[in-house]
């Protein structure tokens, strides 16, 4: 099995992923964080999953239309997500990190663990194998998990969607979304060194301040301390 070579961490940028249920406010918070990072004179790249690169965006359209259910169910869907991630990481994320950019990504492999693993009935062995092929030992420097009551999140998503038809995941039953929230909370508890669980049931600016504090304490201040001691 092919293993990805790690990027030289002394030269690379930083990789921050955003996770959470529907309507948690990921897109808004990514935009607000990007503005703060750019104000701090840090080059940023905003992207998303599934998608981000031309090949992955094509797969995204098929996934959100529900093609996974048509061609084989949860396992087929997991394979499509893996194909999209491989293209995304290889053609967009890794080159940006190598250039020293800060990459902000709307969803990453934690969403795969939640949607396809815990709630999609895909075996852990298959997910681990796909993860090894697509990203190897690569991990985000920080994962922001936006936590919000399910009913509030779905109401926000409905307002955002307007008259458009709900996508493949927004159409799931309420119990699915409750389970999803619990999985993300479990991930945050299991990996506190990587994850910051943020209460997203507040005004966007207040949530943004909480995220900025996590970024500052976990990434910016350690980097500055390291630069001074070098």
Swiss-Prot record:
Keywords, comma-separated and alphabetical: ATP-binding, Kinase, Nucleotide biosynthesis, Nucleotide-binding, Transferase
UniProt xrefs under SUPFAM superfamilies: P-loop containing nucleoside triphosphate hydrolases
Reaction catalysed by this enzyme: dTMP + ATP = dTDP + ADP
Enzyme class, UniProt record, top EC level: transferase
InterPro entries linked: P-loop_NTPase, Thymidylate_kin-like_dom, Thymidylate_kin_CS, Thymidylate_kinase
Coiled-coil zones: none
EC number: 2.7.4.9
One BP term from GO: dTDP biosynthetic process
Domain of life per record: Bacteria
One GO location term (cellular component): cytosol
Pfam families: Thymidylate_kin
Binding site for ATP: 20-27
GO MF annotation list: ATP binding; dTMP kinase activity
Record's function text: Phosphorylation of dTMP to form dTDP in both de novo and salvage pathways of dTTP synthesis.
UniProt record similarity statement: Belongs to the thymidylate kinase family.
Stated name of the protein: Thymidylate kinase
């Amino acid at each position: 099995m092919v293993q990805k070579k790690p990027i030289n961490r002394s030269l690379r940028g930083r990789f921050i992923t955003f996770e959470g249920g529907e309507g948690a406010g990921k897109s808004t918070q990514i935009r607000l964080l990007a503005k703060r990072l750019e104000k701090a004179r840090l080059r940023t790249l905003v992207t998303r999953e599934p998608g981000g690169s031309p090949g992955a965006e094509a797969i995204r359209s098929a996934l959100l239309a529900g093609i996974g259910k048509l061609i084989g169910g949860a396992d087929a869907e997991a394979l499509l997500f893996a194909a999209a991630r491989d293209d995304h990481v290889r053609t967009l994320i890794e080159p940006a990190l190598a250039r020293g950019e800060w990459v902000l990504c709307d969803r990453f492999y934690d969403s795969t663990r939640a949607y396809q693993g815990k709630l999609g009935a895909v075996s852990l062995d298959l997910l681990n194998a796909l993860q090894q092929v697509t990203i190897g030992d690569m991990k985000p420097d920080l994962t922001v998990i936006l936590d919000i009551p399910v009913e509030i999140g779905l109401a926000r998503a409905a307002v955002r969607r307007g008259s458009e038809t709900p996508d493949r995941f927004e159409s799931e039953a309420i119990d699915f979304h409750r389970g999803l929230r619990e999985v993300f909370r479990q991930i945050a508890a299991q990996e506190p060194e990587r994850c910051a669980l943020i209460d997203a049931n507040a005004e966007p600016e207040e949530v943004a301040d909480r995220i900025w504090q996590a970024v500052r304490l976990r990434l910016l201040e350690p980097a500055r301390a390291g630069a001074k001691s070098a």
